[in-house]
Curated annotation (Swiss-Prot):
Belongs to the heat shock protein 70 family. PROSITE patterns: HSP70_1, HSP70_2, HSP70_3. This is Chaperone protein HscA homolog. GO terms for molecular function: ATP binding; ATP hydrolysis activity; ATP-dependent protein folding chaperone; unfolded protein binding. Transmembrane segments: none annotated. Disulfide bonds: none annotated. It comes from the Bacteria. One of its GO terms (biological process) is iron-sulfur cluster assembly. Keywords: ATP-binding, Chaperone, Nucleotide-binding. The gene is hscA. HAMAP family: HscA (MF_00679).
Length: 622
């Protein structure tokens, strides 16, 4: 396809200066590393030829550890010290993960991100992920024969700021230079688009082990533009496993709480094997012997499994509908649907996608590898290993709006959701009170109109504002989201030049369904939110006018006779009494009455100020 030429700093001008960079898919179930070799992206195998590395780490006493296949094989005998699906814990707090389905771990009550107690001490998800990333880095350096200059690491499009920051921290801990965090659906589109010369509108349906993303992309002459993104950061293949696990226990008359942790892990592993077998066969047999000596033997059909997981399949279609709506396109406009993630091998998923979009999904690239391959292509570009006609432009988006709290607990959106990144947007605000010398900046994320209904990301203060009349100061607040989707906020008072800033690093991320719930709530409650916003705005304006009028009466009350002053004071009292109420129309009417009732007073104050300014001056001096 014809490709768009762009310039990146540090591009290698000659082949012999080629720098080694890789793409890494840090997955919930499996991870892998890929690189561009001889102009072709390929997944790099380990010394036994296996490409996929199970995302499993087992901690041993005295600092020992097993990573990948060895850890997975020993998970059933030491479940408490063998961490699986750690990606689900990235950027999460203890309260959010303690109820994780059938998790055998001891979670530690520590501030910030969740911690897990092992025989080798307390470990964070960042440390566990770093073990996996370090293993992949070593594999790449052994295969490629040199040190890496950097890596592009993929993350779910619906990962929030905390989860992205945790991923970057894990990479640094693993000794990796992060060239870019790349959204997984976008990486898949790169691999598919460049491989097939595709153009047009495409949907990327990405169902991994622990997350689901749906992105709508427009591919045109080397430009990959993400029109909209939707998803569920706590829905993946693991959830299908747990549903089947629960079904097996019900059929056997067993209670999960009564099972030994090693039996839970063993049974989950065997259930996952049944799920995978049903992708190729109409039925599969579960045959497992528990530590108690009890043997479970069950035959599970593909139809039984499909009926069991139908609610989860429908959960993937809700974000799909939202993404199409946000992109202002219909399912019929989509030229192709790219499947990503091992969970998309399930026939129930492929059938649902085909039915919804009215066309068979595109499956000519390995769904387990396509994300890493796309990341490798992007890494090769960012490392400077490009040649003529080998560039493209990525236009990715943020999944939720970013805003700031204004007077009255309202949210002023600075960057709306589905804005292309990197992006910087600025807006001016002013002071509310006379002589105000500081301003609190409260950064929030979400789609609702009130701060109380959105997620708080960060707070900081701008101090040193010169004392001025209310409304005279000009504070410019700038929001900047980088190519990794990470946010920084800057505030500057325009007259004095005083500045303050914050790099947003929340202690941990959104809850399991918070992002989807935020969007759903914003649609369901739009009318209520707007009424609430109108009321808050009316109350804020009423308070401002009452305070301004009282200050004017204190300063220049002698400009009014007794009758006029009594009228103004009555209007002030009426507005002050109405302001705390919930009748926005009544507050607006009282505000208007006070404003009109003080017009003559304002004119007299203006004349007084003019006379004072002109006193003692001659006409030719003016």
């Amino acid at each position: 396809m014809a490709l768009l030429q762009i310039s990146e700093p540090g591009m290698a001008p000659a082949p012999h200066q080629r720098r080694l960079a890789v793409g890494i898919d840090l997955g919930t179930t499996n991870s892998l590393v890929a690189a561009v070799r001889n102009s072709i992206p390929e997944a790099l195998p380990d010394d036994t030829g296996r490409v996929l590395l199970p995302s499993v780490v087992r901690y041993l006493e005295k600092g020992g550890r097993r990573i990948g296949h060895a850890a997975k094989e020993e998970a059933a005998i030491d479940p408490r010290n063998t961490i699986v699906s750690v990606k689900r814990f990235m950027g999460r707090g203890k309260a959010e993960v303690e109820g994780a389905a059938n998790a055998p771990y001891e979670f530690v009550d520590a501030p910030g991100m969740v911690q897990i107690r092992t025989v080798d001490g307390v470990k964070s998800p960042v440390e566990v992920s770093a073990e996996i990333l370090a293993t992949l880095r070593q594999r790449a350096e052994d295969t490629l024969g040199d040190d890496l200059v950097g890596a592009v690491i993929t993350v779910p499009a619906y990962f929030d700021d905390a989860q992205r920051q945790a991923t970057k921290d894990a990479a640094r801990l693993a000794g990796l230079n992060v060239l870019r965090l790349l959204n997984e659906p976008t990486a898949a589109a790169i691999a598919y688009g460049l491989d097939n010369g595709a153009e047009g509108l495409y949907a990327v349906y990405d169902l991994g082990g622990g997350t689901f993303d749906l992105s709508i992309l427009k591919l045109t002459k080397g430009v990959f533009e993400v029109l909209a993104a939707g998803g569920d950061s706590a829905l993946g293949g693991d959830d299908f496993d747990h549903l089947l696990f629960a079904h097996v226990l019900v059929q056997a008359g067993l209670d999960a709480a009564a099972l030994a942790p090693e039996d839970v892990r063993l049974l989950l592993d065997r259930v996952r094997g049944v799920k995978e077998a049903l992708s190729a066969a109409q039925q599969a047999q579960l045959d497992v012997k528990l530590s108690t000596g009890e043997k479970l033997v069950q035959t599970i059909t593909r139809d039984t499994f499909a009926a069991l997981v139908e609610p989860l399949v429908q959960r993937t279609l809700a974000p799909t509908r939202k993404a199409l709506r946000d992109a202002r396109v219909s399912a019929a406009d989509i030229k192709g649907v790219v499947l990503v993630g091992g969970a998309t091998r399930m026939p129930v998923i492929r059938d649902a996608v085909e039915k919804y979009f009215g066309q068979p999904p595109l499956v000519n690239l390995d769904p387990d590898q396509v994300v890493a391959l796309g990341a490798a292509i992007q890494a090769d570009l960012l490392a400077g290993n490009r040649s003529g006609g080998d560039d493209w432009l990525l236009l990715d988006v943020i999944p939720l709006s970013l805003g700031v709290e204004t007077m009255g607990g309202l949210v002023e959106k600075i960057i709306p959701r589905n804005s292309t990144i990197p992006v910087a947007r600025a807006q001016e605000f002013t002071t509310f009170k006379d002589g105000q010398t500081a301003m609190a900046i409260h950064v929030v994320q979400g789609e609702r109109e009130l701060v109380s209904d959105c997620r708080s990301l960060a707070r900081f203060e701008l101090r040193g504002i010169p004392p001025m009349a209310a409304g005279a100061a000009r504070i410019r607040v700038t929001y900047q989201v980088d190519a990794d989707g990470l946010l920084s906020v800057f505030a500057r008072e325009q007259h004095s030049g005083v500045e303050a800033s914050v790099v947003v690093k929340p202690s941990y991320g959104l809850g399991d369904d918070d992002i989807a719930r935020m969007l759903e709530d914003s649609f369901k409650t739009a009318e209520v939110d707007m009424r609430a916003r109108a009321l808050r705005e009316a109350q804020v304006e009423a308070q401002r006018l009452v305070e301004a009028t009282e200050a004017a009466l204190a300063a220049d009350g002698d400009l009014l006779d007794a009758s006029e002053r009594a009228t103004v004071e009555a209007l002030v009292a009426s507005l002050r009494a109405l302001a705390p109420g919930d009748d926005a129309n009544a507050i607006d009417a009282a505000t208007k009455a006070l404003a009109e009732g003080t017009d003559e007073f304002a004119a007299r104050r203006m004349n007084k100020s003019i006379k004072r300014a002109l006193a003692g001056r001659k006409l030719d001096e003016i």
